[in-house]
């Protein structure tokens, strides 16, 4: 059974638009990992227009008699940018990436020419700046200088939706010395907080969206945000639309059927992968360990939140399994194992050979090593197909580096060795395991990665900045617990380092660490956004998404150890079906009356 969507022809740009008809399966869940079955096809031969592509995606044609004449219109950048923002927030931008790239290239040319359609409207200017900077175009924040101080801002533009766009623009600050974005962020965040506190945002959906942005902007997980956007979606909050009819294409019941089917497809895949993770966990006998954390559900959620495309199943499973293994072994080093047993695991990984049962020394060591050994070997086999070369030496090396950092930390706190913050971070950035999790998952993105790329200084710097962010965020939230456990932590190291100088308070130490987090986050963003790179942008994006994961996990607690918000988000992302949108509901009611 299939659905056919018929949409009106809507003028949008100067590109060719042709009407087509396309069919989509109706079934709620499609349990498959086949790329050809999962990926919704998007081949165009006649049109490169953004809305034309959306129309062809949803409405396609089955015979030439339905073809409509070519229509040419002037480019409308404000509407195009709103369209892109909607597609990204609704999680379907991946189907229109070439069209989005074309729109942003045109936007950049007009930005350089200071086109009035962009610069005359504050919201459009802020949105264009954000999109262009994220895409890697050289755009200066000087163009936002007129809005850097609230006292100089015309009260007429200080409506909530405009300030939200200025706030989002301020979040792409990549230089420490950028005082314009710093000031912009200061007043827009204050303004929006005041609006929430005074309850002056009458639109409930907009109120919730502002609340969501302010809560933890850099910890927003893409797929969680998609689910929220689908629940809250309302085109009415865009103030710069010149022709409302142009948005009928993304605000009608047919489009929401498409969105819901796309989300349900992804959700079904996540459910299947959770079952696979649970079977793997039991097959590896990790469920028999009577210590530490079982993070199967947590890891499944984090993988789903970071790698949203249905076809990236191998990347999600590799990422999730690596998180589980890291957590189990980390807990063994910290809590359950003796120093000798911990050393034994490192020796076994260096040797990388299976042993007779009696040679492992303990049941726990045997289970942990064999689980790691079998899983990494499986990764290597799958990656060989995708990469066209053996990556097992790389994967083993990553684990040796990680376990060596575990050993250094173990030696430091058991020997009560005094460290400076720099000495601590020299190994602690490795022990947060971002490097092994990220580089393992990168093997399964469908991008060929050479040894030179993975051993480059750029790769090392990406890993280091990412790891500094997540390591220090973790340390701030786990400081009290780890102090009681007598384990090493950046906060305790900083406090101890000033013991013989001017003593600093815990608040001052935490503030200093948060400054380091921000510095490394901006450096990471700059590396991800830059155009010149040995890594494709698809790979660099993963580093940024994993840093957002750190902000998500350690915003106000330790969601990895005691997941609360995470479990709520997992329900909506993995388990709860997407409800009918009011537009669809109205259509169903109307159909029932006929």
Swiss-Prot record:
Positions with a binding annotation for Mg(2+) 2: 330, 334
Record localization: Plastid, Chloroplast
Pfam families linked: Terpene_synth, Terpene_synth_C
Pathway(s) the chain acts in: Secondary metabolite biosynthesis; terpenoid biosynthesis
E.C. number: 4.2.3.-
Binding positions (Mg(2+) 1): 330, 334
Residues noted as binding Mg(2+) 3 in the record, renumbered to the chain: 474, 477, 482
Enzyme class, broadest EC rank: lyase
InterPro entries listed in its UniProt record: Isoprenoid_synthase_dom_sf (IPR008949), Terpene_synth_N (IPR001906), Terpene_synth_N_sf (IPR036965), Terpene_synthase-like (IPR050148), Terpene_synthase_metal-bd (IPR005630), Terpenoid_cyclase/PrenylTrfase (IPR008930)
GO cellular component, one term: chloroplast
Principal subcellular localization: plastid
Family: Belongs to the terpene synthase family.
Role noted for this protein: Involved in the biosynthesis of labdane-type diterpenoid including cleroda-dienols, and peregrinol lactones and furan derivatives, dopaminergic diterpenoids that can bind to dopamine receptors in the human pituitary gland, have probably ability to lower prolactin levels, and are used to treat menstrual cycle disorders (e.g. premenstrual syndrome and mastodynia). Terpene synthase the catalyzes the conversion of peregrinol diphosphate to labda-13(16),14-dien-9-ol, and of syn-copalyl diphosophate to dehydroabietadiene and syn-isopimara-7,15-diene.
Protein name: Class I diterpene synthase TPS6, chloroplastic
């Amino acid at each position: 059974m299939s659905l056919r969507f018929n949409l009106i022809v809507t003028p949008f740009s100067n590109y060719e638009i042709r009407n087509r008809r396309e069919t989509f399966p109706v079934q709620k869940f499609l349990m498959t990992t086949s790329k050809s079955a999962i990926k919704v096809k998007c081949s165009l031969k006649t049109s490169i227009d953004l809305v034309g592509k959306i129309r062809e995606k949803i409405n396609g044609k089955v015979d030439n008699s339905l073809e409509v004449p070519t229509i040419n219109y002037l480019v409308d950048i404000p509407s195009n940018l709103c369209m892109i923002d909607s597609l990204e927030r609704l999680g379907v931008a991946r189907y229109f990436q070439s069209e989005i790239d074309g729109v942003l290239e045109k936007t950049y040319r007009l930005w350089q020419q200071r086109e009035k359609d962009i610069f005359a409207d504050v919201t459009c200017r802020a949105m264009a700046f954000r999109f262009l900077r994220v895409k890697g175009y050289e755009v200066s924040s000087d163009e936002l200088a007129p809005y850097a101080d609230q006292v100089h801002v015309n009260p007429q533009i200080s409506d909530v939706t405009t300030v939200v766009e200025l706030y989002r623009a301020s979040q792409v600050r990549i230089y420490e010395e950028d005082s314009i974005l710093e000031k912009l962020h200061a007043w827009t965040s204050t303004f929006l907080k005041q609006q929430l506190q005074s309850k002056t945002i009458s639109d409930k959906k907009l109120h919730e969206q502002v609340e969501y942005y302010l809560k933890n902007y850099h910890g927003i997980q893409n797929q969680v945000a998609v689910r929220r956007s689908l629940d809250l979606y309302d085109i009415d909050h865009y103030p710069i639309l010149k022709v409302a009819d142009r948005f009928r294409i993304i605000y009608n019941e047919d489009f929401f059927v498409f969105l819901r089917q796309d989300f349900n497809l992804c959700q079904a895949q996540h459910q299947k992968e959770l079952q696979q993770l649970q079977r793997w966990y039991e097959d590896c006998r990790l469920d028999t360990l009577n210590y530490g954390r079982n993070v199967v559900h947590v890891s499944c959620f984090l993988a789903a939140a970071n790698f949203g495309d249905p076809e990236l199943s191998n990347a999600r499973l590799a990422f999730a399994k690596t998180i589980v293994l890291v957590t189990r072994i980390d807990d063994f080093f910290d809590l359950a194992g003796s120093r000798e047993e911990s050393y034994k695991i490192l020796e076994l990984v260096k040797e990388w050979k299976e042993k007779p049962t009696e040679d492992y020394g303990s049941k726990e060591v045997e289970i942990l090593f064999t689980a790691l050994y079998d899983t990494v070997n499986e990764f290597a086999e799958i990656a060989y197909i995708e990469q066209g070369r053996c990556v097992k030496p790389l994967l083993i090396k990553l684990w040796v580096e990680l376990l060596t950092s575990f050993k250094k930390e173990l030696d430091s706190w058991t020997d009560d060795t005094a460290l400076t913050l720099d000495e601590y971070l020299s190994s602690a950035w490795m022990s947060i395991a971002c490097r092994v999790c990220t580089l393992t998952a990168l093997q399964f993105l469908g991008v060929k990665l050479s040894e030179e790329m993975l051993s480059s200084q750029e790769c090392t710097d990406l890993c280091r900045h990412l790891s500094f962010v997540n390591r220090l965020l973790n340390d701030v939230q786990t400081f009290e617990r780890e102090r009681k456990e007598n384990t090493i932590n950046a906060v305790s190291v900083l406090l101890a380092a000033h013991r013989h100088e001017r003593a600093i308070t815990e608040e001052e130490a935490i503030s200093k660490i948060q400054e380091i987090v921000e510095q490394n986050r901006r450096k990471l963003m700059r590396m991800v956004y830059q155009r010149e790179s040995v890594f494709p942008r698809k790979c660099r994006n993963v580093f940024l998404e994993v840093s957002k994961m750190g902000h998500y996990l350690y915003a106000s607690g330790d969601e990895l150890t005691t997941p609360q918000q995470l479990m709520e988000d997992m329900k909506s992302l993995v388990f709860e079906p997407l409800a009918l949108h009011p537009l669809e509901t109205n259509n169903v009611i109307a159909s029932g009356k006929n």
